[in-house]
Amino acid sequence: MMFRVTSVGCFLLVIVLLHVAAVTSDDCRPEAAYCEYNEQCCIDKCCQASCSDACRTPGKRVHGHGLLRFFGQR
């Protein structure tokens, strides 16, 4: 009889632990949501306090066009 109680208790403990693991693993933020760390995002990228697939540097494109215009005139 003691064996059954122990087995049932262990079985229930395993179920509870699996449930807790499933709940904590689903705790991520979708794209464009506010974030502070990469681990908070489902896509594992936090760029400028927002979950984003690619980090963009503001002004980089404008700077590149300026160089192309400068070299194109020569």
Curated annotation (Swiss-Prot):
Signal peptide (residue range): 1-25
Modified residues (Proline amide): P58
Cellular compartments annotated: Secreted
GO cellular component: extracellular region
Record flagged with keyword Cytoplasm: no
Superkingdom as given in the UniProt entry: Eukaryota
Tissues of expression: Expressed by the venom duct.
SS bonds (residue pairs): C28-C42, C35-C47, C41-C51, C46-C55
Residues excised as propeptide: 62-74
Tagged with keyword Transport: no
Keywords: Amidation, Cleavage on pair of basic residues, Disulfide bond, Ion channel impairing toxin, Neurotoxin, Secreted, Signal, Toxin
UniProt-listed InterPro entries: Conotoxin-I_CS, Conotoxin_I2
Molecular function in Gene Ontology: ion channel regulator activity; toxin activity
This protein's domain notes: The cysteine framework is XI (C-C-CC-CC-C-C).
Family, as annotated: Belongs to the conotoxin I2 superfamily.
Protein name: Conotoxin fe11.1
Species name: Conus ferrugineus
